Amino acid sequence: MMKELHPELRENVRLLGELLGQSIRYHLGDEIFNKIEKIRIAAKADRNAEISQRKQLKEVLSGLNDEELAPVARAFNQFLNLTNIAEQYHIVRRRAPASELVDNRLDTIEVVFDRLIGQGVSKDKFFAQLADLNLEFVLTAHPTEITRRTLIQKYDQISECLESLDRSDLLDEEYAKIVERLRRLITEAWHTDEIRYERPTAVDEAKWGFAVIENSLWQAVPDFMRQMDAALLERFGEGLPINVNPVRFASWMGGDRDGNPNVTSEVTREVFLLSRWMAADLYLRDIEALRSELSMTACNGELARASGQSREPYRKILAKLRSRLEATRAWAAEALDSTKKPAAEVLLNNAELIEPLMVCYRSLRDCGMEVIANGPLLDVIRRAQCFGLQLVRLDIRQDSERHSDVMKEICAYLGIGDYSQWTEEEKQAFLIRELEGRRPLLPKEWPASAEAREVLDTCRVVAMQPPEGLASYVISMASDPSDVLTVILLLRESGMRHHIPIAPLFETLSDLQGAADSIGRLLDLPWYREYIGGKQEVMIGYSDSAKDAGQMAAAWAQYQAQEALVKVAAKHDVKLTLFHGRGGTVGRGGGPANRAILSQPPGSVAGNFRITEQGEMIRFKFGQPKVAKQSFNLYLGAVLEASLVPPPEPEPAWREMMDKLSHLAVNSYREVVRERPGFVEYFRSATPEQELGKLALGSRPARRKASGGVESLRAIPWIFAWTQMRLMLPAWLGSDTALQTAVDDGGADTLKAMLTGWPFFETHVDMLEMVLSKVDPEIARFYEERLVKPELHPLGDELRRRAGCAVRLINELKGQDELLLDNPVFMHSLQVRNPYTDPLHFLQVELLVRDRAEGETNKETVEKALKVTMAGVAAGMRNTG
């Protein structure tokens, strides 16, 4: 039985839709408004299983003239965005009961604390784990944020208006004023071009990341710490220790150069400095507010000495800190255009920022003013511990081949051989010999190629940064110990005097299968073990492994790789941090965060968890303070629970079944994607893959190489394209054959046992179910009929049949008649969107036909409308790539 939307959510969706309709009617007139309404009503009737309106719907849309295309597309796109705003606000609204949330399995930290206490976790164990907890979100600029920042800001203001409307004490005139503000914002959004015509630069992307911190995370972090503090105090009589900071942030924006020639050493240098400038500016605002509040005269001896016996000691200390922050901000601004070294007043490490604040904090507590100490001052201390002087630590990512090419050039210039032809053992011996020695390797007047110079310039920029500004150096396609040793040597040769974690990234199926062996060989090297000081980070890639092998085989390979890495780390007495390169979509490792964490192999979390947050997911999870605070609840609660009460080991029979499923799935997936004649042509014809390149989504190219087939396409556009035509193929292809074969071979009972007894398999099946609920065979068929040549239609028939088979299998395993019965709110949310997404699909097909037709005279108008439909479908599906 379908569950309706919560009345308050339904009312907000109705209000926003009504205001949008009024705006469209006023500005475009009755004729176009009536056409839009006719399309909407026909789409809704079609979805409600009344007499099919689909033929009429297609005819109306195909009959639109070029000038009507964009307004119609924009109307449905805007409505879907407004629906998303209403849903996102509802998730965090004050009065929303847990049963009404989009995912009613969300746990707050209070619920998690109580569950852990009920399972016998002692206070000492609890606090010891909290003190050792490290949850780090790595913000990346992967090109999946399709909404312009200008519109995001308006959408945030619309959400604030919805919150204001929730007040129970509103007067009629106050209500009317808020509605008028909503009308104005929706009209502003309607008159704002939703299409980005120029790709953002890597620096633009970094600034967008800084804006998320300034507008949301800056408030959300101390708010969440207060929530944790209160929850601990209530349960244990002891709050969160002031030196415990379980949440941190890093970024790839301006640091990820893998396959992106637009991220240069100069860009990275600029981002480091902009980050320092932004941090100083934000702290200055906080310090100014604290100086206004901390007017007290009573202080302890420590503060009296530090302030020179000042009559207003707190203000005196804060004035000194303000002066140093001003100097830091001025230096960062000046250094953008020069190589000026920081003056003595410039703050260089986090301790210089935090210690003056702690002096004030200790004094207030010593003088009996705990209530003041634990006010805004504590919030600023928490921020300083989380964000530091750098605001957000930067990861550097580069392909291992780029480093090897530099070593090849160096060795050739020195006349010591062809580095690329050496065995792995020879490379290791050479690199360790150089690392143990003291003489420089790089010749002073070495005529390096432009490519080698860029790699070394990046290393020099990294070497110049304070340790607290750096997170990790991630190496793509790293399979041998020499890949890691090379980076350490190049950094040392560039002047690096401290250690930075080096994280090999394993992302293809074969890489994942060999990950533990590779790390084991690395940890077998005595020099390297001494260098890392007992800590090793490894990155697991979800996007490319799923694109390479299909979702099911990739998920099992990721699970097994983590298990094996945990054992290797334990053998060498090394603390392992697994860095999860997940995307927003299921095809790229996405899904509900807490359930994903709780389904990791036992021992793989152990208090440390790094995860990428990509593109549009940054906005959905962290774009507003209350939303960000809820995300912290989900992630931290799950990391704490997975660390203190790890899931059980899977049964041997379950492992055997997953081995079988994985083998069947990868073969089935690759048979279609790699070997099936006509598949690539079908993909490029049936989806808007080639047209996606016209969307200025991010600074990074869609392809690693200018030419090539599916293998050269990045995972994001691969997912994006299939999402647009509603086949969602990357997330389920291969799983259908694997599950069907297992059932046919008598494995249904084993699969059902796995579903109820193994969090990993349960989560995988639930994610499969969620993505299959978005598949629409009829819409996919329409794309095929209009865009694909007839001789390839049998392939489409097969794919749609297989998607239907996957749906039937999931329902059989879960003992249900239709998908999403255990997640009715998500089901209804999808069904609310469908009547608004359907016209965008049909319109997109019409536009693709026109755009691809030779002799199309109104190319610019058609392309603009096409881009709007892509944005609208992404909004309807709540993801892009």
Swiss-Prot record:
Cofactor(s), names only, from the UniProt record: Mg(2+)
Active site: 142, 547
Pfam families: PEPcase
The keyword Membrane appears for this protein: no
Keyword field: Carbon dioxide fixation, Lyase, Magnesium
Stored InterPro entries: PEP_COase (IPR021135), PEP_COase_bac/pln-type (IPR022805), PEP_COase_Lys_AS (IPR018129), PEPCASE_His_AS (IPR033129), Pyrv/PenolPyrv_kinase-like_dom (IPR015813)
Chemical reaction(s) catalysed: oxaloacetate + phosphate = phosphoenolpyruvate + hydrogencarbonate
A GO MF term: phosphoenolpyruvate carboxylase activity
Keyword Magnesium carried by entry: yes
Major enzyme class: lyase
Enzyme Commission no: 4.1.1.31
NCBIfam families documented for this protein: PRK00009.1
Role summary: Forms oxaloacetate, a four-carbon dicarboxylic acid source for the tricarboxylic acid cycle.
Name of this protein: Phosphoenolpyruvate carboxylase
Organism annotation: Hahella chejuensis (strain KCTC 2396)
Organism lineage: Bacteria, Pseudomonadati, Pseudomonadota, Gammaproteobacteria, Oceanospirillales
Gene: ppc
